[in-house]
Amino acid sequence: ERAISDRITLAAGQEPVHIPDFMFQHREAANFPWVSQAAWLYAQMVRAGHVVKSGPGYAAAQRVFRPDIYRAAFAGTQVPLPGASAKLEGGINETTGVGTVQGRLLMGPDRFFDGRAFDPDQLDAYLAQS
């Protein structure tokens, strides 16, 4: 509950601190099931040695997130719907407008801590950098 309200306890016994935008639920397609995010999660599992990289495994991971169901559920509402189902993860440096099938959508910076971007079409190259 505190995370959703942007009030985070940083240390035991301290009062929660207000951290604006610690977690947002809808803006910038935060809850959209990007296939590229499923692919990135799979890549992290491979990097950590939790799974062995395989074509069928990678394909299965990408089928887990269902943007088709999300779009069907929100069709005709005010919810902006991205036109793409995958994107370059960690590649947005500044607020950028993205193509939609419904509404207007701005995506904010999403850089990863290590500065690397993840292209779901370049899994082998990404893993080779690990």
Locate the predicted segments by residue.
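Secondary-structure end/capping motifs
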Residues: 1-66
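Conserved C-terminal helix/tail region of periplasmic/extracytoplasmic solute-binding proteins
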Residues: 42-130
